[in-house]
A protein has these predicted regions:
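Charged, flexible cofactor/metal-binding loops and thiol motifs
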Residues: 14-18, 257-359
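ABC ATPase NBD Q-loop/coupling interface
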Residues: 32, 86-104, 142, 213, ...
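P-loop NTP-binding/switch modules centered on Walker-like glycine-rich loops
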Residues: 59, 195-199, 203-285
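Conserved ABC ATPase "signature" region
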Residues: 90-93, 144-164
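ABC ATPase NBD coupling module
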Residues: 94-111, 137, 259-264, 295-301
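A short, proline-enriched helix->beta-strand linker immediately N-terminal to the Walker B motif
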Residues: 188-192
Length: 363
């Protein structure tokens, strides 16, 4: 892609009054296959502003990554097809942009850290070339300027001897170091929005903590927004401002991190919270799994998609799709009984204990 000198960088444009940096409104992405229609993303909505972190949580196949890939314009169509909704960045619809416009958006305005850095990095090119590629495309840097900035970026993300490492290949880096390279690549053009698709899945807990801390440090320094995709609620516990819980392509609960952990209203969210390992070793409580398997996205029944696995499901749940119950703060959950105080007494004890202890500490 040649740098288009007539292209107006959207990052230089103010967010229209009354709008958000990123607005996803009832997004639906379906895949049309020989076996049927896969409803991979079915009605996702959220907003994101500068400096905010959104955690997107759910099991494999819940639509987390497909939502992100749709925003980035990386879904092949066909078989993919946007069946409804919109994605607006700084007031402009991404879905209506041409491919040339999207090439300017990717990496420059919205960047993505992919799940597996070993398959995301090109094994035949040196690290310095790959980190500096975006700078040459979007900023018009020369080869020497891009290499110099790539060296600075590797140093920024904590890779030792960056002057030497820019001339090495991906196979010469450990898993944690490769993930740092991916972060350096994503941050090269100082994007407005950084999408991190399970960036810590294959890493041990020590490196995992370092990567999360690094992302938070970069956010504090640059003020960018982060979308953190993960299957583990514990990963986003300390870094997310807002959390969206997805199941079978649909958002089942959305709220602030405090609301999700302390005031959750959906049984699937409760299951995710109960599956987080406890820190207190002396209690020796067994983990509580979510029984059953996620449904096929081609054969979703008419009722609540979680009802076959939900221990509280009723006939109403099995026959009627629940509407979102929204509180004044904007916290919503897609459950028939999320407004019932008696039903909410089934919420995890750990969640209520945390909430009670927090209140006690504030008193």
């Amino acid at each position: 892609m040649k740098k288009n000198k007539n292209y107006v960088d959207l990052k230089d444009q103010p967010v229209p009054e009354g709008q958000h940096l990123l607005e996803v409104d009832d997004l639906k992405m379906y895949f049309h296959t020989e076996d049927g229609v896969v409803r991979a993303v079915d009605g996702v909505s959220y907003t994101l502003d500068r400096g905010e972190t959104l955690g997107v949580v759910g099991e494999s196949g819940s639509g987390k990554s497909v939502t992100a890939m749709t925003i980035m314009g990386l879904i092949s169509m066909p078989p993919g097809k946007i069946e409804g909704g919109d994605v607006r960045y700084r007031g402009r619809s991404i879905l209506e942009m041409t491919e040339e416009e999207m090439q300017h958006i990717r990496g420059n305005d919205i960047a993505m850290i992919f799940q597996d850095p070993m398959t995301s990095l090109n094994p035949v090119y040196k690290i310095g070339r790959q980190v500096g590629e975006g700078l040459r495309l979007h900023r018009g840097y020369s080869k020497q300027e891009a290499l110099k900035r790539a060296t600075e970026l590797l140093d920024l993300v904590g890779i030792p001897e960056p002057e030497k490492r820019v001339n090495e290949y991906p196979h010469q880096f450990s898993g944690g170091m490769r993930q740092r390279v991916m972060i350096a690549m994503a941050l090269a053009c100082d994007p407005d929005i950084l999408i991190a698709d399970e960036p810590t899945t294959a890493l041990d807990v020590t490196i995992q903590a370092q990567i999360i801390e690094l992302m938070q440090e970069m956010q504090e320094k640059n003020g960018n927004a982060i979308i953190m995709i993960t299957h583990d609620l514990g990963v986003v516990a300390d870094m997310a401002d807002k959390i969206m819980v997805m199941y079978a392509g649909r958002p089942v609960e959305f709220g602030t991190a405090e609301e999700i952990f302390y005031e959750s209203r959906h049984p699937y969210t409760w299951g995710l919270i109960r599956s987080i390992p406890e820190q207190a070793i002396e209690e020796k409580k067994p983990l509580t799994p979510i029984h059953g398997n996620p449904p096929s996205l081609m054969n979703l029944h008419e009722g609540c998609v979680f009802s076959p696995r939900c221990p509280y499901a009723t006939d109403k749940c099995r026959k009627q799709r629940p509407e979102r119950v929204v509180t004044e703060s904007g916290h919503y959950s897609a459950c028939h009984y999320s407004g019932d105080p008696e039903f909410l007494k089934n919420a995890p004890e750990t969640s209520r204990t945390r909430k009670d202890s927090k209140k006690g500490g504030e008193a």
